[in-house]
Amino acid sequence: MIPNPLEELTLEQLRSQRTSMKWRAHPADVLPLWVAEMDVKLPPTVADALRRAIDDGDTGYPYGTEYAEAVREFACQRWQWHDLEVSRTAIVPDVMLGIVEVLRLITDRGDPVIVNSPVYAPFYAFVSHDGRRVIPAPLRGDGRIDLDALQEAFSSARASSGSSGNVAYLLCNPHNPTGSVHTADELRGIAERAQRFGVRVVSDEIHAPLIPSGARFTPYLSVPGAENAFALMSASKAWNLGGLKAALAIAGREAAADLARMPEEVGHGPSHLGVIAHTAAFRTGGNWLDALLRGLDHNRTLLGALVDEHLPGVQYRWPQGTYLAWLDCRELGFDDAASDEMTEGLAVVSDLSGPARWFLDHARVALSSGHVFGIGGAGHVRINFATSRAILIEAVSRMSRSLLERR
C-alpha cells in the first residue's frame, strides 16, 4: 500500500524546498493553510513521465488527444461516466482561463453570469474582468445549492439579458469553499431549470477526483438535460500540478458546435509538459490518489476534532469533497469586510479581513478570508487541510492560543 502522501514532508523541508506561492507569500514563521496547494511530493508516475520527456528533449508544443483519452478512461472507471467523447473536448491553459474562453463562446460583453455565493473568488474576478455581469444566487444556510434562489436568479437574469438573450451559470462542482458535493438529484434540478430558462451551464469540476469516502461525484454532463452544457477538468488539484498548466474543456452533445468555434490559438497556451503530467496523473496516478484520499479523510476528521476541542465558537462544516474546510467564525465577533453587497471585483484572493486577519497577525497562520468569496462569506475562513497532521495540529494550537490571549 502506498504511504500517506501528506506525511512525507516535514515543515523544515517544505520551508527550505518550496518556492511556490503557498510557501513564499508569507514570512517563514507563518504556517500557510490558505491557497489550494497540497504539501505533497510529486506522484512518482507523474515524475517519471516528466523525467522521460526532459531526458528525451520532448519539450515542444502540445499535440494530440492523449489527455482527453486519459480523462475519459478515468471518468469511466471512477464515475461510470461512459459518454465523454474525445471529439467534444479541447485542451485549454487551465480551468479558469478555459471557463473564460467558453463564456466567450456563449455570452457577449454585458451578459449575466450566475454564481452560487460564497464561491471561489476568481469566479467574480475573471467573469467581471471579461465584461460580463455577475449575478449571485446564494447557497442555503447549510452550504448547499438553493434551487429556489437559483431559479429566481435564472428568471431575473433572463429578464435583464438584453438583446443578446444570453445567460450563463457558472457551477462549482464540487463546491469551493464549502466542500459540498452536489447530488445527482440537485444536478438534475439545475439542468431542468437551466433548460426552462434557456441558461447555458459551465461546470468547474477541477476538484472532482477529490472525494473521500461518504460522497459520490456526479459529472454535470452526465445528467439528463445537460446536453448543451460544458465542463472544465484538470489534474491540477488532485495531483498537485498547479504549476504545470493544462486543462480540458468538455462539451455536451448539443454544445459541440460551440466548442468547435473556440479560437485555435487558445490551444497554444497549455504547456506540453503540463499535458504530459496531467495525462500521466489521470492514467497512472490512481493508486497514489487513493492513498491521498485516505489521508485527507483522516485529516478532515482530525480537523473537526481539533476545532471542537480548541476553537470554541467556531463551527466546522464537514467537507464532503476537496481538501478545503469552511469555518464559521462569526460567533467570535470580529469586524469583517462586508461581502453581502459585493458581486464583482473580488479578485484579490490574498486580501484579508476579520478572523483571517486576526489569525495571521496573532497566530501566524495564513487562511483564506471568507469575505472574498462573496455573499455569505464574511465572518468565515477557508482552511486547507492537505498537509501533515503535525502542521495541522500546530496551526489549530496557534489559533487557539491567539483566541485565549484575546479574551
UniProtKB/Swiss-Prot annotation:
The keyword NAD does not apply. GO terms for biological process: methionine biosynthetic process. The modification N6-(pyridoxal phosphate)lysine is found at residue 237. It comes from the Bacteria. GO terms for cellular component: plasma membrane. Its cofactor is pyridoxal 5'-phosphate. It catalyses: L,L-cystathionine + H2O = L-homocysteine + pyruvate + NH4(+); an S-substituted L-cysteine + H2O = a thiol + pyruvate + NH4(+). Pathway: Amino-acid biosynthesis; L-methionine biosynthesis via de novo pathway; L-homocysteine from L-cystathionine: step 1/1. One of its GO terms (molecular function) is pyridoxal phosphate binding. It is an enzyme of class 4 (lyase). Its EC number is 4.4.1.13. Keywords: Amino-acid biosynthesis, Lyase, Methionine biosynthesis, Pyridoxal phosphate. The keyword Disulfide bond does not apply. Gene3D superfamilies: Aspartate Aminotransferase, domain 1, Type I PLP-dependent aspartate aminotransferase-like (Major domain). Belongs to the class-II pyridoxal-phosphate-dependent aminotransferase family. MalY/PatB cystathionine beta-lyase subfamily. This is Putative cystathionine beta-lyase. The lineage of its organism: Bacteria, Bacillati, Actinomycetota, Actinomycetes, Mycobacteriales.
